[in-house]
Amino acid sequence: MPFGAELSAAGARFRLWVPAARQVELDLAAHGSRRSVEMSALADGWFEATVADAPAGTRYAFRIDGGLTVPDPASRFNPDDVHRPSMVVDPLAYEWRDAGWTGRPWEDAVIYELHVGAFTPAGSFVAAIERLGYLADLGVTAVELMPLADFPGRRNWGYDGVLPFAPDASYGTPDELKRLIDAAHSHSLMVFLDVVYNHFGPDGNYLHAYAPQFFNPAHHTPWGAAINYDGEQNRTVRNFFIHNALYWLEEYRFDGLRLDAVDWIVDESSPDILVELASSVREGPGAGRHIHLVLENDRNEAHYLGRDRERRPLHATAQWNDDIHHAAHVVVTGEVDGYYADYAARPLWYFARCLAEGFGYQGEPSPYRGNIARGEPSVHLPPDAFVSFLQTHDQVGNRAFGERIGHIANPRALRAAVACILLAPSPPLLFMGEEFSASTPFLFFCDFGPELALAVTQGRRKQFARFARFADPALQATIPDPNTEAAFERSKLVWSEAEDPGHREWSELYRECLGIREAHIAPRLRGVTPSGSFEVERDELMYARWTLRDGSHLQLAANFSAHRSHPIVQQVGQTLYASHPVALEAGNEVLPACSVRFTLRSA
């Protein structure tokens, strides 16, 4: 890797890109002694030094022009947080035990998103290992970790990271993260990592001070000037993030990446950074392993999800489908505030369209966005290009009180929606604790210094003031302060709940549906074509149909009304799942209220 500290037979080589600097010194500390080494200026803004006796464990920082001292932006580990020196790490020290593991094909994907700090009481990489067997038994095939990039303080969602190569020390060491991934592979679980390539966090990002070339002031984002993917001197910046992706996939053996909010990556060059990154992954670790790239993209840009003639992804494997969440949420809760307004008129139609065609908005005007056209046509894409879900960290945690959908939805309608998500061809995603209807909230939490903490708290309350429910300042004041330790502690799962009968009913539903998916649906998904179709009747009954790889037809009929109904579309074939016993009335099938039936008809 051209960035950071690299060990070799000659010692440790340190590199820093700082185009505007005249002088850079390397400050080293090991075994109680300190020293400084003058770094050599190279071409294109690089400074470099090789030190023979700087083994793993050595602390180091860079002093720029005799003043500002900064950690390594490509630090592999910062044990004392983001403002302190970095540590030399030997990436070959860990002895892997997953020889022969090459990942799993995408059609197997059942994803479980978790926050390492809130997943277990200890909140560590090592503690998470204890739950891997449970996840595999549930039917999960991939664990997705919320961002790990080093952030300021002891707790954070991860989207305020400033050292993107360094797993945050609050969760454990680099080798302990490798142990977690190694253990997951032993359970046949893939591991994905959420990465943030659209901004750096507000506290601990020194790049603005000494390498402003990392940013392009011509483009603006909610975090300030955009990362410089297309301005002057962008090549080093692009390489920084491409190497970051390769680093996680190769050095840590992650099986895929989820790229956060790529709609805020501004890049007018060609090929853009997403295309170049995907190509680098495909030609690198993806050449011999199953590697999956998943996007979060509010713009619904289908062109990133295209397939070649063999139905292999050209760029990204899939995208989180926020539309299916929003539509299903309106169906089961009736909430229509904020972005849910886009689905309020025909929620079941949008839900069915997402199941069959991918995006709910494929170029139509979005009322929530001022009737601006949103999205691109997606009907030509296969269902595996879209990740479906009813809960994520965003959709739970961005509520004022972090309530999970189980606390606000009609339980019968929610069970029906769960079956639709888990048994439709698109890969499903669960958010930690969803499977047993966890009662704990997932609140927004962070650990900033006093000035920034106050700004975050006030900003969050101001954000919710736009909703009629929070017009009263007194009610705004009840919104939890994200900077308190209590906000973090309340967000931790209480695993004893999973054994309670009421919670176990939910996990049994998930286990049953995922078992059916594994046995009957996943084996028929490889190379599946874009064949989905749907109908909606009176915004109460929903039908969807897909042609699978072997020519068989997967069929869904769902009644989301409060009364039983006779479906117009009759299902023929083997019943894979029925939420209620199949009933006939005068020779015609009857769908009870809030019920779902999946059938499989042979070719």
What residue spans do the PLM features occupy?
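Core domains of carbohydrate- and sulfate-ester-processing enzymes
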Residues: 64-99, 187, 205-222, 338-369, ...
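The feature marks proteins involved in alpha-glucan
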Residues: 1-9, 13, 34-113, 120-123, ...
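Glycan-recognition and catalytic regions of carbohydrate-active enzymes
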Residues: 360-374, 430-445, 470-554
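Short, well-ordered beta-strand segments enriched in hydrophobic/aromatic residues
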Residues: 14-16, 553-560
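C-terminal beta-strand-rich structural cap/linker in extracellular carbohydrate-active enzymes
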Residues: 18, 56-58, 586-603
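Conserved alpha/beta catalytic core and glycan-binding cleft of carbohydrate-active enzymes
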Residues: 82, 274, 278-472
